[in-house]
């Protein structure tokens, strides 16, 4: 993260903090009605993190500045990369620790759906000739069976378990250090699905499973894919979960140029981005009186 980006984050987050200080708690006015009147309670602050692909590291920068400014976060909602960063933060990871894990990760290995070679049994190393993502093909009584995604997502979910290690064993997302919701999309109906319990790593993977590129995740009988299709900036869910004030961080990915559409993942991601933009626009049409939007210039 370069110096100019850090300054921009600091200015945006500082503006958010000052805006919340200016409005005070629910129902608070500039002048107290009585010297003996009890101070209004401080507003509960929710954080809504958008999807945005590789730009998701920007969420960590915002979290670091909010932490430095001691802005309390009472709940988190996230979509796609926002769910990954938000879920990791909600599990108890400090932003600096999260940034280190993400920057040092072997992303090539993670997206190859294959553990490090040293961890593979000798008898399995002979299978190295298989295709990069090893999608499973087969024949069933219904005909040819094709993979639901180029990437099965096994290594991705394993990495998410590492990110969420502090919350190991917690399945009720209300009982995490910070209450959390991940947003996904039901591929059968197109409905937005709010994941509030179960494996936090699985919830993260469901929220970022780009259709056609990363295999969908089945949770409670529903086949789930990238949440950006149905709700890419879950401001409404942050309000439902806890928030009097929502800090919404929008890092939505702009359309890729033709020269950048070089893989199945980038093509599928482009379609998700188009759909996600519509949902972000819809969310921003209904802002709360005291909500704060942070949109880093990336």
Walk through the language-model features, giving the residues of each.
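Patatin-like phospholipase
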Residues: 2-4, 9-10, 21-79, 87-298
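Hydrophobic helical h-region of N-terminal Sec-dependent signal peptides
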Residues: 14-18
């Amino acid at each position: 993260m370069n110096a100019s980006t850090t300054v921009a984050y600091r200015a945006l987050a500082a503006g958010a903090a000052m805006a919340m200080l200016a409005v005070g708690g629910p129902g608070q006015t500039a002048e107290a009605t009585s010297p003996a009147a009890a101070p209004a309670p401080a507003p509960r602050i929710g954080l809504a993190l958008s999807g945005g692909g590789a730009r998701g590291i920007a969420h960590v920068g915002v979290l670091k500045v909010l932490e430095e400014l001691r802005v309390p976060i009472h709940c988190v909602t996230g979509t796609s990369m926002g769910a990954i960063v938000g879920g990791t933060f909600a599990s108890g990871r400090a932003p600096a620790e999260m940034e280190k894990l993400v920057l040092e990760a072997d992303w090539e290995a993670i997206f190859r759906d294959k553990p490090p070679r040293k961890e593979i049994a000798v008898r399995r190393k002979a299978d190295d000739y298989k295709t990069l993502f090893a999608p499973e093909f087969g024949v069933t009584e219904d005909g040819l069976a094709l993979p639901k995604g180029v990437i099965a997502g096994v290594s991705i979910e394993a990495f998410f378990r590492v990110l969420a290690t502090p919350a190991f064993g917690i399945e009720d997302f209300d009982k995490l250090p910070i209450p959390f919701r991940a947003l996904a999309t039901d591929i059968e109906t197109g409905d937005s699905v709010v994941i509030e319990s179960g494996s936090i790593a699985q919830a993260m993977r469901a929220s970022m499973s780009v259709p056609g590129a990363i295999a969908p995740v089945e949770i409670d009988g529903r086949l789930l894919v990238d949440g950006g299709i149905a709700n890419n900036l879950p401001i409404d869910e942050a309000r439902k979960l806890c928030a009097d004030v929502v800090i919404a961080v929008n890092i939505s990915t702009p359309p890729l140029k033709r020269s950048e559409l070089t893989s199945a993942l980038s093509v599928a991601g482009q379609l998700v981005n188009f759909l996600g933009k519509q949902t972000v626009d819809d969310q921003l049409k209904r802002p709360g009186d005291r909500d704060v939007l942070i949109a880093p210039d990336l």
